[in-house]
UniProtKB/Swiss-Prot annotation:
Quaternary organization: Homotetramer.
Protein name (record): Xanthine-guanine phosphoribosyltransferase
UniProt catalytic activity: GMP + diphosphate = guanine + 5-phospho-alpha-D-ribose 1-diphosphate; XMP + diphosphate = xanthine + 5-phospho-alpha-D-ribose 1-diphosphate; IMP + diphosphate = hypoxanthine + 5-phospho-alpha-D-ribose 1-diphosphate
Primary role: Purine salvage pathway enzyme that catalyzes the transfer of the ribosyl-5-phosphate group from 5-phospho-alpha-D-ribose 1-diphosphate (PRPP) to the N9 position of the 6-oxopurines guanine and xanthine to form the corresponding ribonucleotides GMP (guanosine 5'-monophosphate) and XMP (xanthosine 5'-monophosphate), with the release of PPi. To a lesser extent, also acts on hypoxanthine.
UniProt keyword annotations, A-Z: Cell inner membrane, Cell membrane, Glycosyltransferase, Magnesium, Membrane, Metal-binding, Purine salvage, Transferase
Organism field: Jannaschia sp. (strain CCS1)
Lineage: Bacteria, Pseudomonadati, Pseudomonadota, Alphaproteobacteria, Rhodobacterales
Length: 172
């Protein structure tokens, strides 16, 4: 196991911080939906978008929540994660989604924008929101809270213990 960061810079996010930033995202989205300011549903991009989506749904009192599972990274076996072509593993309910109008699609981070680019082609009228955004991916997101440099690696609390630990079942 390497002791080096996967990228030049690391930004550690605590549970408290992701909660505060996700609430800030909800406040920014409040009263901006197409139905008199309301949104009809929240769709989380799994897995990273699940915690922010839960918080946004709670804050905006949105009861219809679904997920879309997109894979665009491959764990590099102790090396930095490697990008690969994005593909949908599980889509949200088709009747709910239509072209995406009135739906908030939430993720934790837009990095290269490849995941959001794929999902946007499927649901062009959805509103895409992330908590954090890197410059390369910013054009793919409609609303975000905090910008971070492209060379910053974000360590989310669901990936961390006192030090990084691999998931019990391994990778991918």
């Amino acid at each position: 196991m390497t002791t080096q960061l996967p990228h030049e810079k690391g930004f550690h996010i605590s549970w408290d911080q992701i909660h505060r930033d996700s609430r800030a995202l909800a406040w920014r989205l409040d009263n901006h939906g197409p139905d008199d300011g309301a949104w009809k549903a929240v769709v989380a991009i799994t897995r990273g978008g699940m915690a922010p989506a839960m918080i946004v749904a709670r804050e905006l009192d949105i009861r219809t929540v679904d997920t879309i599972s997109v894979v665009s990274y491959h764990s590099g076996g102790g090396k930095a994660d490697e990008r690969r072509e994005a593909k949908v593993l599980k889509g949200p309910d088709a009747d709910l989604m239509g072209d995406g109008e009135g739906v908030l699609i939430i993720d934790d981070l837009v990095d290269s924008g490849k995941t959001l680019e794929l999902v946007r082609t499927l649901y062009p009228k959805a509103h895409f929101a992330t908590v954090y955004a890197k410059p390369e991916g910013e054009p793919m997101v409609d609303t975000f809270i905090t910008g971070v440099s492209q060379d910053t690696w974000i360590f989310f609390p669901w990936d961390m213990a006192l030090q990084y630990v691999d998931p019990y079942r391994g990778k991918d």
